[in-house]
Amino acid sequence: MKRIFILIVKSYQFLISPLLGNNCRFYPSCSHYMIQAIERYGIFKGMYLGLKRLSKCHPWHEGGMDPVPSSCHCKDEKNRKDQAEKEKEKEKN
């Protein structure tokens, strides 16, 4: 079942993405992120993470480096966000 969802995303990468151009504001791209998340966490958690990432893909989000989390728990995600904010503050100073 995982293979089917990954095949759908890879089809998008091959058929549709070249027509839209390289517009992703994140690294890895949203489609690569979705594939990695599905491979790591399975269909449901992977799709959740991928769709959550897609919801951030808009002009008002700064983008940047956003790898698939090493664990998929709300507490870990909050800690990751806090760490990212601390790093941004260090860069400003």
UniProtKB/Swiss-Prot annotation:
Lineage: superkingdom: Bacteria
Any coiled-coil regions, as ranges: none
Record's compositionally biased regions (Basic and acidic residues): 73-93
Pfam families from the UniProt entry: YidD (PF01809)
Gene Ontology CC annotations of this record: plasma membrane
UniProt-listed SMART domains: Haemolytic
Membrane topology value: Peripheral membrane protein
Location relative to the cell: Cell inner membrane
Functional summary from the UniProt entry: Could be involved in insertion of integral membrane proteins into the membrane.
Family: Belongs to the UPF0161 family.
Name of the featured protein: Putative membrane protein insertion efficiency factor
